[in-house]
Structure formats: structure tokens, C-alpha cells
Amino acid sequence: MLVFSGSDWCIPCIRFNKQILSDSSFLRFAGENLVLLEADFPQRKKIAAPLRQQYDSLAAAFNPEGAFPQLVLLSPQKKLLAYIPYREETPDGFITTLKHLLQ
């Protein structure tokens, strides 16, 4: 799962990180079912140029509109499976959504 985030300016991104990405039940599920990659686009913090180039390339392919947070489910072959709309929900609710999409 690819997560486009603005870690120091995007309030919904910060919420998603705290409520979902940091939750132990989600981390357990993700460890067994997903490869997680967060492409972070901070405004105040600098990231290394090579990493920024990789994130820009991912954004061009999977987030051309520049939506934040943008949650993208990809196959192991990097095929787009689904865009997952951000909603404030519980970790269990988000896990249920992912399980449905992974079937």
C-alpha cells in the first residue's frame, strides 16, 4: 500500500498516521498482508534529493492530482488495484476495507 502524505502540514494525513498507521492491530495486519511505503511530501522538513525524486516519480504515476492523503493499493507487480478514499475510521474499519479489496 502506497500512502502519499504531507506529514508536517496535512491535518488528515497526520490523523491517518496517528489513528491507523501507528495502531498495533493495523501494523500486525500490514505486516502479514501488505508492503507499506509512505511517500512523504513535507513542507518544512527537507528530504534527500534522491528520495524526493523517487516520491515524485511515484506521484506522477499514482497521484497526479496531488491529493493528500492519497492511499493506493498496488499488486506486487505495481499494478493499480484500488484508490482507497480517506475517511476517519477505526483501525478495524480500515482493516475490513483492505481485506475486502485484497480478495
Residue ranges, per PLM feature:
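Short active-site neighborhood of thiol/selenol oxidoreductases, capturing the structured segment around
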Residues: M1-C10
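Thiol-based oxidoreductase modules, predominantly thioredoxin-like and allied folds used
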Residues: F26-Q53
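Non-catalytic, surface beta->alpha helical segment in thiol-disulfide oxidoreductase systems
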Residues: Q19, A60-Q103
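Extracytoplasmic/secreted cell-surface and envelope-processing proteins
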Residues: I11-C13, K46-I47, L81-A82
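Hydrophobic beta-strand anchors of alpha/beta hydrolase catalytic cores
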Residues: M1-L2, L36, L71
